[in-house]
Amino acid sequence: MLSGLIQRFEEEKMKHNQERVEELSLVRVDDTISQPPRYAPSAPMPSSMPTVALEILDKAMSNTTGATQTQKAEKAAFASYAEAFRDDVRLRQINRHVNEQIFPKLKSDLGGLKKKRAIIHMTLLVAAVVALLTSVCTLSSDMSVAFKLNGTSAEIPQWFKSLNPMLGVVNLGATFIMMVCAKSERGLNQQIDMIKKEVMKKQSYNDAVRMSFTEFSSVPLDGFELPLT
């Protein structure tokens, strides 16, 4: 029994000595020394393009209710500049080339719509003149208006009064043509305004890509230096 106690005491003593050695082997380092070394920031600074894009887009987000077409075109130009500032360099180049390819088609469509609007407008004017003349003729014959020529009274002949039904039909047809032409002209005006706005947006985008960015930084939007002339 005594030998067992001695053996147990020796084991506990050896264990205590081992823990003491392990504790002494640990080196305490100050917290400030244990921190990693501080280096100067080497990462590239974030581009200011998104901030500029947001500022430009803020000008384009104002209310356009009751605004003129010129003001709407101005807001569309601001939006295009903001889009150009926001896009990546490669995406800007792709959009610029696509815009240059679509410009001839847009201008051709715009010219065709303007010619069509001119034809419809002339038809509207002719129909308005016909409707006015037929209305005057019908009204004069219905009222049996008499004219004095060289002191003699001349009334509208009976055969002219018999044309009233036909004149009424012509007047109705001319009025219908006026309504159709007016509606078609309004639709064409909307399409022309939309195409003009689209052309303005694409031209503004291309101008933003091409322009030298010297007003804000030394880097142009194209990603390469532009010669100053």
From Swiss-Prot:
Positions of transmembrane segments: 119-139, 162-182
Domain of life: Viruses
Keyword tags: Host cell membrane, Host Golgi apparatus, Host membrane, Host-virus interaction, Inhibition of host innate immune response by virus, Membrane, Transmembrane, Transmembrane helix, Viral immunoevasion
GO term, biological process aspect, one: symbiont-mediated suppression of host innate immune response
Membrane topology of this protein: Multi-pass membrane protein
GO cellular component: host cell Golgi apparatus; host cell plasma membrane; membrane
Compartment(s) of residence: Host cell membrane; Host Golgi apparatus
UniProt record similarity statement: Belongs to the orbivirus NS3 family.
Summary of the function given for this chain in its UniProt record: Plays a role in the inhibition of host innate immune response. Interacts with host OPTN and thus inhibits the recruitment of TBK1 to the host Golgi apparatus. In turn, downstream partner IRF3 cannot be activated and IFN-beta production is impaired. Facilitates viral particle release either by increasing plasma membrane permeability through a viroporin-like activity or by viral budding.
Subunit and interaction comment: Forms homooligomers via coiled-coil motif. Interacts with host OPTN; this interaction inhibits innate immune response.
Name listed for the protein in its UniProt record: Non-structural protein P8
